[in-house]
């Protein structure tokens, strides 16, 4: 993955970008909010977990043009579920809930973004996903536990508006999915989410 990213950046650095065109170097920063549904099915763990509610997402895409209006990029994203975590028995009986912990999904992968006329775009990324639980009870917000790396996917579609020769501001809808096994076969985590994203793109 590191060699791929370095090669990608080297290719992008050599490409000269013209104004109001999708060529050369590509940088996309996006922040948004929406909904995520998270489930943890226990195997050796004592209880199941579930969190469904408001989420926030941050994305970074970095790469370059490989064909007309087509960008190849590395994708880094993080989704935080801001709702309470419910703890349940394996039979589904609720044991309690807590707001002192929050679930996070992170992904590192590769993707393609394609621009249609009128600056409408579609984007897809696939990579390694990982879940962790964050302790919100103190200022340090320590990570309490993390799963193994699993599968992550993001699909997005939206529109951008040029605000300078090479910068554009955008609005999109992003769907994310992640699934991973916990360490030592304690359980299986999965999550899906839909977020409205606001972005700034240099291209």
Each model region followed by its residue ranges:
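Cleavable N-terminal export/targeting peptides
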Residues: 1-23
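Short glycine/proline- and aromatic-enriched beta-strand/turn motifs that initiate or cap beta-hairpins
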Residues: 17-86, 191-203
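Transmembrane beta-barrel architecture of outer-membrane proteins
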Residues: 56, 78, 106, 128-132, ...
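Repeated loop/turn-to-beta-strand initiation elements of outer-membrane beta-barrel proteins
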Residues: 68-74, 119-122, 161-169
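Predominantly the C-terminal beta-signal and adjacent terminal strand-loop region
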Residues: 36-42, 79-88, 94, 135, ...
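Surface-exposed loop and membrane-interface regions of Gram-negative outer-membrane beta-barrel proteins
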Residues: 49-50, 72-111, 132-134
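Membrane-embedded beta-strand positions of outer-membrane beta-barrel proteins
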Residues: 27-31, 74, 110-112, 122-126, ...
């Amino acid at each position: 993955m590191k060699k791929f990213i370095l090669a990608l950046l080297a290719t992008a650095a050599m490409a000269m970008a013209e104004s109001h065109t999708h060529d050369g170097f590509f940088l996309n920063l996006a922040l948004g909010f929406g909904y995520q549904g998270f489930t943890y099915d226990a195997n050796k763990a004592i209880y199941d977990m579930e969190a469904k509610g408001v989420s926030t997402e941050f994305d970074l895409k970095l790469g370059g043009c490989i064909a007309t209006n087509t960008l190849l990029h590395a994708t880094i994203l993080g989704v935080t579920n801001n709702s309470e975590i419910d703890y349940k028995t394996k039979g589904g009986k609720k044991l309690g809930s807590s707001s002192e912990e929050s679930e996070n999904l992170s992904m590192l992968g590769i993707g393609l973004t394609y621009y249609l006329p009128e600056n409408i775009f579609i984007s897809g990324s696939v990579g390694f996903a990982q879940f962790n639980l964050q302790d919100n009870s103190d200022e340090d917000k320590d990570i309490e536990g993390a799963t193994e790396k699993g599968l992550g996917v993001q699909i997005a579609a939206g529109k951008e508006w040029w605000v300078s020769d090479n910068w554009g501001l955008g609005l999109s809808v992003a769907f994310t999915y992640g699934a991973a096994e916990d360490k030592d076969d304690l359980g299986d985590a999965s999550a899906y989410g839909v977020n409205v994203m606001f972005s700034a793109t240099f291209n």
